[in-house]
């Protein structure tokens, strides 16, 4: 072993085991915190945990579960476990008493082993319950028993139905038993931010990159779509997301990528006439906000066709899915997408005019 390789190995081990030690310490700290909190509860009051830590589209899709769990445990103190970067999606939810910013799955595993929570609803399965630094997966026995994993989950319904099954809230392949329309809890601060942007009266929001490349549509085709929209419609085009990969110079185009929080983005989408995007987090914001959506989709792994949405998008009441059976999103031609977008804009205009 070379000296450089030796140094790399021990640097890796140092950071790994320092991380694991911190996870253990934070778990014990959280256990003491919840133990003290529980000691102040009224007799019979339960401490309930809901676990959906990422990604933000999944958290939005799972929002109806918070209301359903509250209906099952009206007097309980309900805590939602989430990655700190997504806490704002939970902070303002009136069905949740506390947002817990999770350090990593090891912290959660140790905390739950202390049995301070009376009931845990895990909305995750092992494949998306992972800490790269600890190099461990955290299994969900309920999901394992039902055969729900990253290779099968869309065989069990939309995301809301899948998460409800992984928590044993519903039986396999059964509809969600309560209101399945996701909600957002936007505050004045989010509305004020949107006001400060001085958005045009009529605009379309676009989102061009997901967190998973196989769901994406090529940037060059997005540029063509923006040009076509600008030449044929009076709408302004507003792009949202983390970072733009477009090169368009259209005067009607505005880039807001990287400038907004999740809920500020949601408010911008809510004000739009249309949302054109991918199967990604912002499309779930559009569903929850009630904005008509045009969603570019394709086959995904073992799923040649799937529907991740519940509520109005799931029923395609105000959503148009742009896809071709068996083709990946990247394989959709620009002409095909333009045709479907034109049909959706026309259909929606006719519906609004009735």
Model-derived features: where do they sit?
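Catalytic machinery of carbohydrate-active enzymes
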Residues: 1-354
């Amino acid at each position: 072993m070379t000296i450089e390789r030796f140094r790399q190995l021990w640097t890796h081990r140092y950071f790994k085991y320092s991380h694991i030690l911190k996870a253990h310490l934070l778990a014990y700290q959280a256990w003491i915190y919840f133990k003290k909190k529980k000691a102040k509860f009224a007799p019979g009051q339960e401490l309930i945990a809901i676990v959906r830590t990422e990604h933000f589209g999944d958290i939005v899709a799972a929002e109806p579960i918070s209301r359903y769990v509250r209906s099952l445990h009206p007097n309980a103190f309900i805590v939602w476990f989430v990655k700190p970067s997504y806490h704002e999606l939970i902070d303002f939810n009136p069905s949740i008493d506390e947002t817990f910013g999770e350090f990593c799955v090891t912290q959660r595993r140790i905390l739950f082993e202390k049995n301070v929570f009376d009931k845990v609803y895990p909305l995750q399965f092992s494949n998306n319950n992972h800490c790269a630094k600890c190099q461990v997966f955290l299994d969900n026995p309920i999901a394992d028993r039902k055969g729900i994993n990253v290779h099968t989950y869309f065989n069990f319904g939309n995301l809301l139905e899948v998460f409800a099954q992984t928590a044993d809230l519903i039986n396999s392949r059964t509809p969600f038993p309560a209101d399945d329309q996701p909600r957002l809890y936007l505050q004045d601060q989010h509305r004020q931010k949107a006001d400060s942007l001085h958005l045009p009266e009529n605009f379309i929001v676009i989102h061009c990159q997901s967190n998973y490349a196989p769901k994406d549509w090529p940037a060059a085709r997005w540029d063509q779509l923006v040009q076509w929209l600008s030449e044929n419609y009076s709408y302004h085009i507003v792009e949202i997301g983390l970072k733009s990969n477009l090169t368009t110079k259209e005067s009607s185009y505005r880039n807001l990528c990287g400038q907004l929080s999740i809920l500020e983005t949601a408010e911008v989408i809510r004000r739009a006439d249309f949302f054109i995007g991918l199967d990604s987090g912002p499309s779930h914001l559009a569903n929850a906000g009630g904005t008509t959506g045009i969603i570019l989709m394709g086959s995904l792994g073992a799923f040649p066709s799937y529907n991740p949405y519940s509520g109005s998008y799931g029923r395609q009441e105000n959503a148009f899915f742009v896809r071709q059976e068996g083709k990946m999103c990247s394989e959709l031609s620009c002409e095909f997408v333009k045709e479907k977008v034109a049909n959706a804009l026309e259909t929606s205009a006719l519906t609004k005019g009735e």
